[in-house]
């Protein structure tokens, strides 16, 4: 059996990039249904946000991996969040990053950095 990390207690992290707020919430999940339910709850909690992008990895061997850009340009939100999770070597994890648009377009590079940065911050503030 290979070594892996799991979330003991989820956390949050927030960064601000050109007046846009990126709020990451990290959750421990055991199934895809649980992840989808939490994503829906997060959308309701942050109903006034522009985007709720997410990524999750579920299963001992990371069998289930999903991500969503939630109407951000393709590959600028969900994939960077997923890459942060993979880089940290964590399974049974869901990271949802909520964006409140600040009025300034960040460009694709800026979005990737912001979503990655928020995800890293959220994971750093979680107990793994």
What are these regions (language model features)?
Residues 33-40, 44, 83, 113, ...:
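Solvent-exposed alpha-helical segments within well-ordered globular domains of core cellular machineries
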Residues 75-104:
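Ordered, amphipathic secondary-structure segments that act as subunit-interaction surfaces
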Residues 94-97, 104-128:
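Glycine- and Gly-Pro-enriched alpha-helical subdomains that act as flexible
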Residues 1-75:
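C-terminal regulatory domains involved in ligand/effector binding and gene-expression control
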């Amino acid at each position: 059996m290979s070594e892996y990390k799991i979330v003991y207690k989820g956390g949050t992290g927030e960064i601000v990039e050109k007046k846009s707020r990126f709020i990451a919430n990290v959750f421990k999940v055991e199934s895809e249904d649980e992840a989808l339910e939490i994503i829906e709850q997060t959308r309701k909690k942050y109903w006034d946000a522009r985007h709720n992008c997410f990524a999750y990895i579920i299963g001992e061997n990371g069998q289930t991996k999903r991500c969503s850009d939630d109407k951000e340009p393709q590959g600028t939100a969900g994939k960077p969040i997923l890459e942060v999770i993979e880089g940290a070597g964590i399974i049974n994890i869901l990271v949802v990053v909520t964006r409140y648009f600040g009025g300034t377009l960040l460009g694709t590079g800026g979005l990737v950095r912001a979503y990655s940065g928020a995800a890293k911050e959220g994971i750093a503030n979680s107990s793994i």
